Amino acid sequence: MNSRLIVTGTDTGIGKTVFSAALCHALGAAYWKPVQSGLEEETDSEIVARLAQASPQRILPEAWRLNTPASPHLSARLDGVEIRPEEMHIPATSLPLVIEGAGGLLVPLNDKTLFADLFAIWRIPAILCARAALGTINHTLLSLEAMRSRDIPVLGVAFIGEANEDTETTIAHLGRVKRLGRLPLLDDLSPEKLHHSFARNFHIDDFAGVAR
């Protein structure tokens, strides 16, 4: 069975999409963003296609494309629609698949359902992206508790940002979670530099053996 992985995060804007692009390139995976909020600027699917140097066939169409860059429940409301998670089915592909959530783990899809609730239904191993900056211990441990309370399989934590050895070690120990690696912030975010940085800081075997 083909590998499927979820990429989620402790917050919005922490680098999930850049990490997803690097992971897609490393695995030769397809990419799916179930909900895209905000269409005026480059979308996350377009960013991944560019940074992963992925063919159009590897970028699967979003289930929901919403105009306003906001939490999915609000963006949908402003568009006059309601996101129905029960109708959101994982697309079929012959490739490994990276699924990226929107915003943080507990972002609402509608008035009743959080993204984490959808992940709990899918039961696909999830990577939690976390900042390596001050405050991330609290955010990351809370996110891990939320995942485990829903029986979401946790593959590990991917840190993003400048090195903070004590913080990363503390989270791995107290959170009882695998420390997958750390993706540093790149001044020149080119596909080549991103691919090289990912290969230098992560072990592909930590991701390639996952199958559901």
Curated annotation (Swiss-Prot):
Alphabetized, the UniProt keywords read: ATP-binding, Biotin biosynthesis, Cytoplasm, Ligase, Magnesium, Metal-binding, Nucleotide-binding
Catalyses which reaction(s): (7R,8S)-7,8-diammoniononanoate + CO2 + ATP = (4R,5S)-dethiobiotin + ADP + phosphate + 3 H(+)
Which residues does the annotation say bind ATP?
13-18, 100-103, 184-186
Kindly list the places in or outside the cell where this protein is found, as annotated in its UniProt entry. Cytoplasm
For this protein, the record's InterPro entries field holds: DTB_synth_BioD, P-loop_NTPase
Cited PANTHER family: ATP-DEPENDENT DETHIOBIOTIN SYNTHETASE BIOD 2, DETHIOBIOTIN SYNTHETASE
Kindly provide the name given to this protein in its UniProt entry: ATP-dependent dethiobiotin synthetase BioD
Species, as recorded: Brucella canis (strain ATCC 23365 / NCTC 10854 / RM-666)
List the taxonomic lineage: Bacteria, Pseudomonadati, Pseudomonadota, Alphaproteobacteria, Hyphomicrobiales
